[in-house]
Amino acid sequence: MIFKDYDFLQNYDLKNFEEKVKIYKELLSKFNRIHNLTHLKNIDENIFDSIKILDFYDFSKAKNIADIGSGAGFPAVFLAFLLQSNFHLFEPNPKKAAFLRTLKIECELPNLHIYKEKVQEYKNTFKADIITSRALMDVKPLLEICKNLKDENTVFILWKGSEIYQELENIKDYEIFENNLRRYCILK
């Protein structure tokens, strides 16, 4: 995938990003042979899906970003490749958390913090400016399990499908941006 062709990425260090993406793909291939971390077939499409939100939302003021159910790193890892924010990834699966820790070391990402626990069990020391999650669970239960990380200024950015409209019943302050079948939902 040629990232320089996308206007919304022009203000980022794409050479560094592409180097880290290469390391990510190699590491994922190694881990996947043994641990079967993900069934995704087109990694490039999923990387693009992870960073496309930068076309819709300005992350520049976010100091702490929490990602819930990080799995193989989509979307948080790729945002961490581009942004200076501190990323706090919550992934209770030991194999996936080990992959993320290895990736942090291999890509030299001091802004990436991995927690091998469920977010609702975390004894927080920070409040997140942004909480992200990609297709983990319905909106309302997600809001509930994240209550220890949020305050009145926290923004949720969710990667969802077309079902998002039903999930937002009785929720008032949100925006949805569409890209193909993806719905990027921003809850304020």
UniProtKB/Swiss-Prot annotation:
Top-rank taxon, per record: Bacteria
Pfam families linked to this entry: GidB
Keyword terms, alphabetized: Cytoplasm, Methyltransferase, rRNA processing, S-adenosyl-L-methionine, Transferase
Subcellular localization, as worded in the UniProt entry: Cytoplasm
InterPro entries: rRNA_ssu_MeTfrase_G (IPR003682), SAM-dependent_MTases_sf (IPR029063)
Function description: Specifically methylates the N7 position of guanine in position 527 of 16S rRNA.
Family: Belongs to the methyltransferase superfamily. RNA methyltransferase RsmG family.
Protein name as it appears in the record: Ribosomal RNA small subunit methyltransferase G
UniProt source species: Campylobacter jejuni subsp. jejuni serotype O:23/36 (strain 81-176)
Gene designation: rsmG
